[in-house]
Amino acid sequence: MNIRELAAEIGVSPATVSIVLNDRPGVSEETRKRIKDAIDKSGYAPAIRKKKAIHQILMLKCVLGEGLLTEENQGFVGMIIDACMQTLTEKGYSPTLMRVQLDTEGMLDHIEFEKYEGVIVIATEIQEKQFKMLEKIPIPFVCVDNMMPGMEYSCVGIDNEENVRIALEYAAECGYKRIGYLKSSYDAQNFEERTRAFYRFAEMYHLEVKKEDEIALTSSMMKAFEEMKIYLDSHEKEEIPPCFFADNDIIALGAMKAFRHRNYEIPADVAIVGFDDIPYSAVCSPSLTTVQVSRQLIGRVAARQMSERLLDEQYKKVKTKISGNLVVRTSMKKYR
């Protein structure tokens, strides 16, 4: 019998059983006694054998394929994880990082969740068709970097709509009337939200987007560079929009390299605004104007949300969106 089956038999949530097994506050004495009695009667391991001197939290990094977003995005996700683990440690928890492949069948089935009190899911690469699999997690969990629309999960992520608005508002303020879209070809929830926001705010700020101005690029600097060169070789210079918004900095930087390789001046011939503010964006030449999102804040908020859920079984599931700010550098200019 596992913790989920035990909880169903008693008529409480797995989170409530976990609280009792770990001798933590947040459950009434009556409920605590009922659960302990059921544990003894069922033969399930007694609470005293499950009590841990240090409260363990599982950091579950979910990776799809090569992990273009979690492994190759210049430490964006890594900074979130570091901030989350540091905050958990400060609160007296012991976080353990585990990497799982999303394309592995039954990837959650062999995880010993009973060793942990809660799970923080690094959900950057989890696709919509995979959202429901997280229902298998029998203990409290918080999803990070994916708002999981349609699911009643606690989540902490990026306010993609507002952050895209910030970027396009600046493009309009600079005087641009037409904008291109360097769209990620990678299927991720964050990118889907940015796509919807891009077209919504392009219309709001009267920025023309031609059908051919949407260019799908891989979220890898080298691949985006090669793909953008192919695009430029098939288009005349006067056909290229004077400004582009990119789904993330990796794509923007790859495209910028391709523009320079094909003798475009940035921002004189073409301007670019990115999204994420990864470290290289500040030191490349020209430096990249981009929307900065605090990775540290996302991590800290996720850790605090996890802690609050564990301390209070009545804690409501919360979805928290983190806004950003524009970092103006030299890849954009006032347009004539």
Go through each PLM region and give its residues.
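N-terminal helix-turn-helix DNA-binding module of bacterial transcription factors
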Residues: 1-54
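Short acidic/polar active-site loop segments enriched in Thr and Asp
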Residues: 13, 45, 117, 176-178, ...
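Alpha-helical recognition/docking segments in bacterial nutrient-uptake
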Residues: 56-169, 173, 233, 250
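Hinge/beta->alpha junction and helix N-cap segments in small-molecule ligand-binding domains
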Residues: 62, 66-76, 97-104, 156-166, ...
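Flexible loop/turn connectors
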Residues: 233-336
